[in-house]
Amino acid sequence: MRYEERKRAGSGPKSVRRLHLTKCSSRARYLVAFTILLVGAAALAQSLYKYQDENGEWIFTDMPPEDQQAAEIRDLPTGSKPPSVSVSTRIVDREFQFIAKNDYYAPVEVVLALDELTNVRHPTADQVMRWVVDPRSEMILLGLTTTGTDPEPAARFRFMSLFGDPRSRHDPPRPYRAPFPVAASYNITQAYPYGVTHDTADSRYAVDIAMPVGTDIHAARGGIVFEVASTNFRGGTDPDRDAASANIVRILHDDGTHAVYAHLNWNSIRVKPGDTVERGQYIADSGNTGFTSGPHLHFAVLQNVGMRIESVPVVFEGPDSRGIEPAMGQVLTAY
């Protein structure tokens, strides 16, 4: 099923805008406007019902079974606040500074737009208003000279942010490992160029692999985990209701691209942001969460190409380390 990187599966990286009116004094007062990039990892505290349907399939839902059959009831934890990217301002020695803070274990691209400046000199016409902020860091984006104190220097501004460094280039050292146990084989139900629902730039080269709920998912390539959503348990074909309820793992690669593993099972993810994972490492169980018509894994490798996310073609490792291009209807085996 469709997994739009900016809209689907509970929180893909998306451009965000915020309008701020900030006044700063020489005491360097801060007004920090937090911009949440990811939603969906946090869930309200509620009950989970687990039971088997008439076909013996395990059902995870927030509704009790209609026929009064026995069901296991669990309390779901309240999710923690996801990381964020923020831009704040301060005055230091008559310089009006714009500071970006990136809480993620991945770089983010930030674009700043200045709508109104009061007693602050405008940047020069050739000033580039786009930066890449390193993981888990703060960066002074811009420093402008103040021109007075009455009224206090102020700025009205907007910013957008997106995962990834646009200077990155997809350069895997070897074909990707099929993301499930060695010697197992599963059908590819969607792959380029026959994407039934993969019709956006960020999903064009995504691969959907049908597999039973609970199948071990292994990292197709090593890297650093920078986002996890694990508390969702609902799946369905209603985009308004289900789009933001997929469990996912994102892993940053050393070439600046990242992989997303989506529709994972409830409470099955075995990694956390900041973890370094190796190729082939067990990271989660497959599931049927989010916008989906049936159990499968959605796998894609993504790249920031300048405030825009695009998927890139992937090749899986086959026999004798030979590269295999995924195709719809193909049986993929892990080696």
Q: Residue ranges of each PLM-predicted region?
A:
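Short histidine-centered loop motifs in beta-beta connectors
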Residues: 212, 218, 255-280
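Short hydrophobic beta/alpha edge segments that flank linear recognition/processing sites
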Residues: 249, 278-290
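N-terminal signal peptide c-region/cleavage motif recognized by signal peptidases
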Residues: 40-42
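Surface-exposed, glycine-biased beta-strand/turn segments
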Residues: 128-245
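N-terminal secretory signal peptides that target proteins for export/translocation
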Residues: 1-27
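Active-site loop architecture of trypsin-fold serine endopeptidases
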Residues: 232-241, 286-298
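Short, cationic interaction patches enriched in Lys/Arg with P/S/T/G and frequent prolines
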Residues: 3-6, 24, 44-97, 103-140, ...
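Acidic, glycine-rich catalytic/binding loops that coordinate metals and/or anionic ligands
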Residues: 173-189, 218, 241-244, 269-278, ...
